[in-house]
Amino acid sequence: MQGRLSRRTRCAGLALGTALLMAGCAGPRVQQSQSSGAGLESVDGATVSLAAFENSAFPYHGMIPNYQETGKTRPFLDVDENGRLGHSSPRGGIHWEDQTYSDRSVLLAAPQSFDPAKPGVIIVFFHGNNATLSRDVIARQQIVRQLADSGLNGGLVAPQLAVDAQDSSAGRFWSAGGFAAFLGEAQSKLGDLYPNARGAFRRMPVIIVAYSGGYLPAAYSLAVGGDQGRVRGLVLLDALYGERDKFVSWAEGPGRSAFFVSAYSASSRAGNDAVRAELEAAGVPTVNGLPGQLTPGVVAFVDAGSVDHNDFVTSAWGGAPLRDIFSRIGG
């Protein structure tokens, strides 16, 4: 899959995240922020920046609600080794805060065709496990290119979650109002990039997109994040692995005035089948495949077939599923 990347994309990813890429080739070390010293770049038909946020997903020193869906809470940082704090992940062992949960970077991007005078949207993208913004979200998964190629008028914001780790922790998105605080800062920083669009960004509806382990911050953003009235769309890419009740509750309630698309491979088929059955039992109509337009009330499930989960974002139908989905969204 790496062979598909354009030379321009690879170079831009290196420019934005050189320190991180070098860290991936070395042994364990303290995580450096991808936003350190990063300015504006032109990447794949979009203007891109990596900015440090106060309301980033991490660092996070709070509790994990509904730990492993048991209804119980526990401290997120539950390991202290001579003052070095860490989180014991049920799948990935111990992840140290200084390596995995200290990067405040957030990807900001808008197509070069972006026009603040026209209707637009803000896309919030939650990446999956074992990912960084520069190496994976920009370069490998081509999220920026897919947005630019779709023709959708809007801005993209993607917070760094657990850095290059097998962990889906939501961090501050677990907190009540965490999503609203993040969104408020995001629209302000997008306004810094496009001063003439400050007012437009404050009014734009929001589309949440989650791939794989990004389901966890997405679920809590919908359930307790605040500003749910601005969320006019939810896109899950092979992501229904847990917290199904939160997605169902949203689709039955606030989501009635939004659209909901869940595309899946065999990896998350069981979760999708379960959510779809619950929604239909509650009287929420669903459709197979993508309709021509994604309008309020659309609930679509897309079976992508035998696609490798790790390559889903660039291999599902046509090789650019987000480009296809974004192209069906009205501003």
Language-model features: locations:
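A conserved short beta-strand
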Residues: 228-239
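Active-site machinery of serine-nucleophile hydrolases
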Residues: 119-122, 126-189
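Bacterial N-terminal signal peptides
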Residues: 13-23
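C-terminal catalytic histidine-bearing segment of alpha/beta-hydrolase fold enzymes
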Residues: 262-273, 280-331
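A domain-start/cap signature at the N-terminus of enzymes
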Residues: 25-121, 154, 287-288
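Short glycine-enriched nucleophile-adjacent loop
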Residues: 215-226
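Conserved acidic catalytic loop of the alpha/beta-hydrolase fold
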Residues: 182-202
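Alpha/beta-hydrolase fold nucleophile elbow
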Residues: 199-212
